[in-house]
Structures are given as structure tokens and as C-alpha cells.
Amino acid sequence: MSGVSNKTVSINGWYGMPIHLLREEGDFAQFMILTINELKIAIHGYLRNTPWYNMLKDYLFVIFCYKLISNFFYLLKVYGPVRLAVRTYEHSSRRLFRWLLDSPFLRGTVEKEVTKVKQSIEDELIRSDSQLMNFPQLPSNGIPQDDVIEELNKLNDLIPHTQWKEGKVSGAVYHGGDDLIHLQTIAYEKYCVANQLHPDVFPAVRKMESEVVSMVLRMFNAPSDTGCGTTTSGGTESLLLACLSAKMYALHHRGITEPEIIAPVTAHAGFDKAAYYFGMKLRHVELDPTTYQVDLGKVKKFINKNTILLVGSAPNFPHGIADDIEGLGKIAQKYKLPLHVDSCLGSFIVSFMEKAGYKNLPLLDFRVPGVTSISCDTHKYGFAPKGSSVIMYRNSDLRMHQYYVNPAWTGGLYGSPTLAGSRPGAIVVGCWATMVNMGENGYIESCQEIVGAAMKFKKYIQENIPDLNIMGNPRYSVISFSSKTLNIHELSDRLSKKGWHFNALQKPVALHMAFTRLSAHVVDEICDILRTTVQELKSESNSKPSPDGTSALYGVAGSVKTAGVADKLIVGFLDALYKLGPGEDTATK
């Protein structure tokens, strides 16, 4: 063969030689040289002979195929072939049924049924009385203060609240004591015109806000030299800011433009809202079926180059279970990722459990290496006025990335620490007054009462109501339960008709009770009413669930065949919040 020596191969000499002859020679190195050379020639010919617009089209097609294939293998790694096939089937089925229900053939029938349910929602939600005045528009002349106060009293009496004062509601009102409400009222009156946007005008509000943040940081064992945070309007804003900070930090430090969050399926819907608002992808991780904690092995599988934040709950809202924060912390450190702990619900319960005498507790705060941010609602078990929460960070660099700064605005130098511009100073003043009034001992006592009641309720179900199954091993203030023998949502409806309101859950179907200072005092009544209602439901096993109750609504939400209908019902509920009366729209008046 010309051009070939014992040690050297001439590429030109090999070009054109049949591949099968090369294989006969058995020289793999020479075969690879030929292959690479032919590839180079092919690429050169493509670049020389292909118009630029076709080249661009081909490039985009290759990128599309690459992303499609890489995403497929990513999901295959995360879920495995069987689970991925099931998820694909469920997703496709939902899309198909959503399309069918929105088709011209079925749209009219579906809308008719949806309208009926919307009407029942409005009838339940919109309440008034003939003795009340109505104000669809401003009165021509202002109403005297005494008359306004009288109307407020009428509204309170004629459109009564649910019996929250009697402890018959899960969560919602966490303290409710008259003395504390009186203190908060005085605080609000003194600072009702204060705005946190103007610290120069209201310097005392700035002082109190900084002290609220400092007190909460110490409760969660933040580093004394670097720990920091801000107050917010509630748990959802705290979660939004934690996600925003993680997104902007990853953008500036890692150049990530397609950010992803990894969170348990039980993480608060505020994380879904953050992903929706800020253009991020939320990867939901399934739970360990025994502990109901997030599956750490699956968390690792979800991590990729776009991951910007890991999430754990302490505890979660649905089941009252705290995720393995220490395990998540190790993963966060290994992959150099931020870890947010959502303790909005746990708040002043989990932070005082040790001092309240509870033993063998997992670490859930900044003592866990890897935890970079924590959210805590002061308006839950901190008993502050509604609209009060704190977002905490391990250091100021993380906090800085939640700020908005604009030095070029024509209205002057502009900056805001949270999502809102104006913020009601009276709320944070009420929070400050509540915290300093309660003191550490007051919160320890509340923790003992509330957790003690929750554990009593849990034990009662385990020992006296065999038809109910406690989910996981809740150790805090929330106890959830399911059933293999009863229609749980029908149980919820029956309890509601008796004046006792539990929270309805789904995936799996369950109920929970979030104990408060109010419900802790009536835990024996709660146990008794639950047991008797379960017995009634069992004795009427052939009865049908209410057609317009919780069973029907959650049945619609959970069925593949009614995909999209639940969305319309939720929108109907939200629309009803702003209607003057059933069938009336605020905008038409």
C-alpha cells in the first residue's frame, strides 16, 4: 500500500480504501484515522455547500433533539421506566380529557354543571342581611363615626364567624385571647399611619422591625455574626423571597438562566407560586411511604446543572411531618446548593420544643450545616397580628439577592427589601408588642399546651379509632389521618355540619387538625366528636356522599376524567370573593 510504512499512516494513502479491507487488516487505529478524516471532509462539504439559513435551521433542530433526548434520559434516571410510563400515561390522559371537555361537543354540558357548582359556592360564601347597609359606591355624604361603628357591630353580629373562639377550627386563629387582642389593638392604633417604606418618618417602627427579626434569628440559632433577615407580609411572601434570592444568586454567581427548585410534594403551594411568578421549574419529589418525609435518594436524582435550591419543611402543612433536614443539609453541602427550610407553620412550636422539655428531636434550624435560609410565620404560633412573617438568611449576601435596587429612577434612588413597596408599620408593631409581651416562657408554655394536646389526639386515634390511620409520626402541632374503610371527605362534611372544621387533604385523601391555644383546651371534645362521627358513618355505610360537599369537590379535582374542571371551580371561588351578591359582579355596580 502506497504511503504506508510500518509505523506511520498516511491519511491520503488510506482515503478511498474499502472499509471491509481495513477491518481485514485489523488495524483499528488506522480505521479510526480514516473515519475521522471522512467526517472532516463531510463537515467541510456541508459548511461549504449549505446556505446559512438551512444551516441555522439544522442547528436549531439538533438543539431541539438534544434537549428532548437529554430530558427523556434525565426523567428516566429520576423515575425509572415504570414510574415514568405511568406519569406519561396520566399526563397524556389529563390532556386528552381536558381537550374533550373543552370541545364543542361537551363544552356546553360541562359549563352548565360548572355554573351550578359555582352558584352553590356563591350561595355558601356570599352572605348579607336586610338590616345591613350596602355600599356598591361611595355615599354622597360621609356617614358619622358612631353610625359606622354601629354598622361594624351589625356586620359582626348578623354575619357571624365560624366558631373559632370555641376551638372548633383547625389552625386559622392561633391564640385568640382577649388580653392579647387588646394589646394588639392599642399597638395598631398608635401606629396605624406608619409605613415601613419611610424609616426616616417612623424611626421607631424601624427599631421594632429590626428587633423582631433579631429575636426570631436567635430562636432559630442563626450565626450571631452573619445571620440576617427581613419581615414580610406572610408565609407566602417569605417563600417567594427565598426562591427569588436563590434565583438571582444563581444567575449572578453561576450564570443559570433556566433555574430549577427541588421540593417535596408536600412543600407549601407558595413554592409552586414562586416558580410560576419567577419563571422557574419546580421538581416535586415523592415521599418515603412509611415516614412521609421527602425521599433523599430521589432528591439526589433530581439534581442537575440548573438546580438552584433544595427545600425541606419543618413541618409540612399537609401531614405535620418534618423532613430530614440534616440529611438534606448533607446533600446541599455535597452539591454546593442552597437549602431553604420552610418553618412557617412550625414557627414558634419547633423553635421552643427543646426548652419545652421534648427529647430526641431532630435539628431543623441553622445548626444544620447547609441550611441557608428559613421562613417563620410570626402570625401563626407567634400569635402576632395577621400579615406577619420573617425570612431569615445565613448571611447578608443571600439576603441582598432578594432586594430590588434602582438608582436610575426619575423619582429618586429607589430600593425595597421585600416584594411590597409600602408596608403597614402597625402590623410589625403589633408583632413586636406580642412577642415582648409573651416572652420566652410564654411561648414555652404555649408549646407545651399545643403539642401536648396534639400528642393526646394522636394517641387517642391510635388506641380508640381503628378505622383511622395516623400518617407518619407527627411530633408537633398538626396530626393528619386517613382511612382504608371510610370516605374521609364525607367524614369531613359530617364534622363540619356539627360545627367542627378539619382541613381536607388529597394525594392521599386525608384530614388534619392543626392544634392552637384555642383547640388545645377542647381536645377531649375533638376526640369524642371524631369517634362518634366515625361510628355514625360506619353504621350508614350504604349512604351516598353529599353531591355538593367536600367529597364531590375533591373527587373532581383528583379524577383524570374531569381534568380542568377543578381549575374552573377554584376560579369561580376566587371570583365570588369580589361579588356584591350571588350572580352580581363588582364591576357592574
Swiss-Prot record:
InterPro entries: GrpII_AminoAcid_Decarb, PyrdxlP-dep_de-COase, PyrdxlP-dep_Trfase, PyrdxlP-dep_Trfase_major, PyrdxlP-dep_Trfase_small. Glycans are attached at N6. Changing K386A: Loss of enzyme activity. Gene3D superfamilies: 6.10.140.2150, Aspartate Aminotransferase, domain 1, Type I PLP-dependent aspartate aminotransferase-like (Major domain). Belongs to the group II decarboxylase family. Sphingosine-1-phosphate lyase subfamily. Glycosylated. The chain crosses the membrane at residues 59-76. It is found in: Endoplasmic reticulum membrane. Pfam families: Pyridoxal_deC. It is an enzyme of class 4 (lyase). It comes from Saccharomyces cerevisiae (strain ATCC 204508 / S288c). It is a single-pass type I membrane protein. The gene is DPL1. Disruption phenotype: Leads to the accumulation of endogenous phosphorylated sphingoid bases, and exhibits unregulated proliferation upon approach to stationary phase. Causes a reduction in total C15 and C17 phosphatidylcholine levels. Present with 13100 molecules/cell in log phase SD medium. Its main location: endoplasmic reticulum. It comes from the Eukaryota. This is Sphingosine-1-phosphate lyase. The modification N6-(pyridoxal phosphate)lysine is found at K380. GO terms for biological process: calcium-mediated signaling; carboxylic acid metabolic process; cellular response to starvation; sphingolipid catabolic process; sphingolipid metabolic process. One of its GO terms (cellular component) is peroxisome. Keywords: Endoplasmic reticulum, Glycoprotein, Lipid metabolism, Lyase, Membrane, Pyridoxal phosphate, Sphingolipid metabolism, Transmembrane, Transmembrane helix. The keyword Lipid metabolism applies. Sphingosine-1-phosphate lyase that cleaves phosphorylated sphingoid bases (PSBs), such as sphingosine-1-phosphate, into fatty aldehydes and phosphoethanolamine. Regulates intracellular levels of sphingolipid long-chain base phosphates (LCBPs). Plays a role in the regulation of global responses to nutrient deprivation in yeast. The keyword Transmembrane helix applies. Its cofactor is pyridoxal 5'-phosphate.
